[in-house]
Structure formats: structure tokens, C-alpha cells
Amino acid sequence: MAVKIRLKRMGSKKSPFYRIVVADSRSPRDGRFIETVGTYNPLKDPAEVVLKEDLVLDWLSKGAQPSDTVRNILSKEGVMKKHHEAKNVKK
């Protein structure tokens, strides 16, 4: 099962609000998901991001692939850097 971390669109017409979710890559964009790991509101200035960092790092370490947009969000929040540092630590 290929697992992705991606955005699930919420909110009403013309006012999008997104949940950052972990989902099977075969399920639809707004369909079934495994776990919610954060939210993203692009309408606020600056965009509001709330992440459960420990859950995101856990899923990344298990092999979940972030979508391009989520990868950019995680990079801005510093999560990708922490993931790469944790991955490169010698055991």
C-alpha cells in the first residue's frame, strides 16, 4: 500500500481550507484517509499551518511520500530538515 501525505479540501466554495492527511494513494482526494496530521489555511496572511510534528515525522520515517504542495509546507515549517537529519544519524 503506497501511503501519501496530502491535502484534503474542506471549507465552502471560494474559501478553501485544507486538512493535511495521511491516505492511501489510490483513494480519492477528499475520500478515505488514515490519519489527520495537520491543517492549512491559505486565506490567512500569512498562511496558517498547524502540524502534529511528531505524527508527520513518524509517517515520513515509515515511508509515506508527501505531495509536492505538502513537501513545500513541511519544508517551510522545518519538518523536512528534521526528517533528513534523523534519517542520516548513524546508529
From Swiss-Prot:
Coiled coil: none
Annotated GO MF terms: structural constituent of ribosome
Disulfide bonds: none
Protein origin, superkingdom: Bacteria
HAMAP family: Ribosomal_bS16 (MF_00385)
Pfam families in alphabetical order: Ribosomal_S16
Originating organism: Enterococcus faecalis (strain ATCC 700802 / V583)
Family: Belongs to the bacterial ribosomal protein bS16 family.
Keywords: Ribonucleoprotein, Ribosomal protein
A GO biological process held by the record: translation
GO terms for cellular component: cytoplasm; small ribosomal subunit
Name listed for the protein in its UniProt record: Small ribosomal subunit protein bS16
